[in-house]
From Swiss-Prot:
The chain crosses the membrane at residues 7-27. It is a single-pass type II membrane protein. It comes from Homo sapiens (Human). One of its GO terms (cellular component) is Golgi membrane. One of its GO terms (molecular function) is phosphatase activity. This is 2-phosphoxylose phosphatase 1. CDD domains: HP_HAP_like (cd07061). Residues 28-480 are lumenal. The lineage of its organism: Eukaryota, Metazoa, Chordata, Craniata, Vertebrata. Interacts with B3GAT3; the interaction increases the 2-phosphoxylose phosphatase activity of PXYLP1 during completion of linkage region formation in a B3GAT3-mediated manner. It is found in: Golgi apparatus membrane. GO terms for biological process: chondroitin sulfate proteoglycan biosynthetic process; glycosaminoglycan biosynthetic process; positive regulation of heparan sulfate proteoglycan biosynthetic process. It catalyses: 3-O-[beta-D-GlcA-(1->3)-beta-D-Gal-(1->3)-beta-D-Gal-(1->4)-beta-D-2-O-P-Xyl]-L-seryl-[protein] + H2O = 3-O-(beta-D-GlcA-(1->3)-beta-D-Gal-(1->3)-beta-D-Gal-(1->4)-beta-D-Xyl)-L-seryl-[protein] + phosphate. Its EC number is 3.1.3.-.
Length: 480
């Protein structure tokens, strides 16, 4: 009995100490760790590497895992966050397609055996996957802009075709769509229950993986949507430049950027040694192996946990993978420093950004069309937009990456509108070149829409130098 009483006494004492400790922390009588800049961890914009959760030195395997974006528990996101007196007006979503089969094969090796049929009880799983498959099977009469109407609405090959979307890719975008549904529809009522076709704007390139990714996100966002209300427009260019694709100066920037990439590769003796070793394993000339872009296929093996290929001469291994991935990371770092890609990005991203602000400006006038815009695209679409916005530290677009522009109206001052920019759920608005100094100049909590409009209409051309003040002049500048 005495032992039992002592045990109960100790238990009560422990509970009391825990309560006191939590109370002191709540009232900030015990200091809690805060970042050096004084911001709380909740408000800190995590576009920069987080020293607590990320390796102190760049780790190629860690970066590759982030790139794979393997579906897991629901992620935390900052979409839809604004002061209570702001009303959400429109949302503009740019996505990279989900996980896909490689575009290239390592010469003389067996293709990775990945099943591109959709199976509801196979990992990765999503609660809406079976319903998605059923709904897609009813969409054969969907009316899309040619040539999209000739593409399959979902992946369905026991052995994936080159570049085909995988089940992982479908699940990634079902998750994206459901997350956006919870925030924009359930919380902010962006669209009415009886939404109409003209309240959506949907555009995709002519690849099955982008159309299917767009449909997966759309199904997560608007489950069991009416096929008669869905119309995807076809975009021939990965830059989504529509009728403004001819731009000689942009092409010159790209040529110089590709030259920079080539020279950096030549300087990397370890990379050349690795390519040489791999070429011997598969018994092809080093030049042929390099041209096959082996990292594309190796990433598929890595993301799907499939062994790297072997021949009688040996096996491609993780060390080879690390060397090539490390070079990719170094290439991205030098790309930011040299600014050639930045020049390419300003001109490459201008048409799609110009379309976006035009759509936003129409929404500020009270127009109810195109309140939700979705561009289903590629890494080579999102990467220039990120660079042009000044988000130089943003990671290269992972599978199923999402970049979102939100337009908000101040209910207390209805004529004033603001924007938020989010990348993979992180609020990066105040990292953009057009709003990074906003808090120094204004007490307003949100970035004014005028900042983005001025950036697209004027500042993008100023950043290029020269005397051009519009897209045509900047694209045809002499003496570049």
């Amino acid at each position: 009995m005495l032992f039992r009483n002592r045990f109960l006494l100790l238990l009560a004492l422990a509970a009391l100490l825990a309560f006191v400790s939590l109370s002191l922390q709540f009232f900030h009588l015990i200091p809690v760790s805060t970042p050096k800049n004084g911001m709380s961890s909740k408000s800190r914009k995590r576009i920069m590497p987080d020293p607590v959760t990320e390796p102190p030195v760049t780790d190629p395997v860690y970066e590759a895992l982030l790139y794979c974006n393997i579906p897991s528990v629901a992620e935390r996101s900052m979409e839809g966050h604004a002061p209570h007196h702001f009303k959400l007006v429109s949302v503009h979503v740019f996505i990279r397609h989900g996980d896909r089969y490689p575009l290239y094969v390592i010469p003389k090796t067996k293709r990775p055996e990945i099943d591109c049929t959709l199976v509801a009880n196979r990992k990765p799983y999503h609660p809406k996957l079976e319903a998605f498959i059923s709904h897609m099977s009813k969409g054969s009469g969907a009316s899309f802009e040619s040539p999209l109407n000739s593409l399959p609405l979902y992946p369905n090959h026991p052995l994936c075709e080159m570049g085909e979307l995988t089940q992982t890719g479908v699940v990634q975008h079902l998750q994206n769509g459901q997350l956006l549904r919870d925030i924009y529809l359930k919380k902010h009522k962006l669209l009415p229950n009886d939404w109409s076709a003209d309240q959506l704007y949907l555009e995709t390139t002519g690849k099955s993986r982008t159309l299917q990714s767009g449909l997966a996100l759309l199904y997560g966002f608007l489950p069991d949507f009416d096929w008669k209300k869905i119309y995807f427009r076809h975009q021939p260019s990965a830059l989504f430049c529509s009728g403004s694709c001819y731009c000689p100066v942009r092409n010159q920037y790209l040529e110089k950027e590709q030259r920079r990439q080539y020279l950096l590769r030549l300087k990397n003796s370890q990379l050349e040694k690795t390519y040489g070793e791999m070429a011997k394993i598969v018994d092809v000339p080093t030049k042929q192996l390099r041209a096959a872009n082996p990292i594309d296929s190796m990433l598929c093996h890595f993301c799907h946990n499939v062994s790297f290929p072997c021949t009688r001469n040996g096996c491609v291994d993780m060390e080879h993978f690390k060397v090539i991935k490390t070079h990719q990371i170094e290439d991205e770092r030098e790309r930011r420093e040299k600014k050639l890609y930045f020049g390419y990005s300003l001109l490459g991203a201008h048409p799609i950004l110009n379309q976006t602000i035009g759509r936003m400006q129409r929404a500020t006038e009270g127009r109810k069309e195109e309140l939700f815009a979705l561009y289903s695209a590629h890494d080579v679409t999102l990467s220039p937009v990120l660079s042009a916005l000044g988000l130089s530290e943003a990671r290269f677009p992972r599978f199923a990456a999402r970049l979102i522009f939100e337009l908000w109206q101040d209910r207390e001052k209805p004529s004033e509108h603001s924007v938020r920019i989010l990348y993979n759920g992180v609020d990066v608005t105040f990292h953009t070149s057009f709003c990074q100094d906003h808090h120094k100049r204004s007490p307003k909590p949100m970035c004014p829409l005028e900042n983005l409009v001025r950036f697209v209409k004027r500042d993008m051309f100023v950043a290029l130098g020269g005397s051009g003040t519009n897209y045509y002049d900047a694209c045809h500048r002499e003496g570049f």
